[in-house]
């Protein structure tokens, strides 16, 4: 069977670290939205018990989250079926948009369906968490308030907007950010309702803009159109619009400056889950 879908990206409308856990990970509080834009992924199921990644990423296949996700499913279920996976990457790597995590979640969701594994959502969320902290939101597939390391998700209805998402010419290494003395890692915990009553922020932004001034330049540029934010640990930044025409006008200005960007709309349901529901 041949199946193609869009592996979407996410934005963090706010992001705070509330403390370090005994296992070395950090607890966070963040509000995710899913966008209708992402990498095109194609799956062709086979009967030869092999997982083949047809797209060359320039590093060993065994290190790829797409491959790891497929092999994790096989190991968990003892599935003897195979698949050929190809991907058309459009999302920037290291942008804080969750592209790689979304790809891994897409593999779990799609192969669970195509291989007739019938794993429930709770199991898929657990598998996703083992692959990465951003994977569960893409298994969830809706806007959600996240706590823990990002795996404790509460679905939230968020008004949908068009977002202009721009990425400067730099990649931000997340691990280095966590080691920074300037990163606030003890923000007092709040409920979602308390967060929504205050101005939003991203705890990584002050650290990133100091190390990467081009991110600050981009945030300042986007401020002409509304409140601008950085997503995740950066470096992609975004601003919300109520209509696509205003977003397109702003994007033209970015194009003149040769700044990479795209326009996408937040959605109530991930395109992956929407496509799978049609099968």
Feature roles, as predicted:
Residues 30-32, 125, 135, 150-157:
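A generic local secondary-structure boundary/capping motif
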Residues 13, 41-43, 66, 100, ...:
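Residue-level signal for inorganic ion chemistry
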Residues 15, 39-43, 134-138, 144-145, ...:
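Short beta-strand scaffold segments in enzyme catalytic cores
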Residues 108-145:
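Contiguous, small/hydrophobic- and glycine-enriched helical/loop subdomains that border
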Residues 32-35, 128, 222, 254:
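Hydrophobic C-terminal alpha-helix "anchor/cap" residues
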Residues 51, 138-140, 144-227, 240-279:
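Conserved, helical-rich catalytic subdomain that frames metal- and/or nucleotide-binding sites
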Residues 86-115, 133, 227-241:
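Glycine/serine-rich anion-binding loops at beta->alpha junctions
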Residues 1-94, 113, 117-122, 149, ...:
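ATP-binding N-lobe of GHMP and related small-molecule kinases
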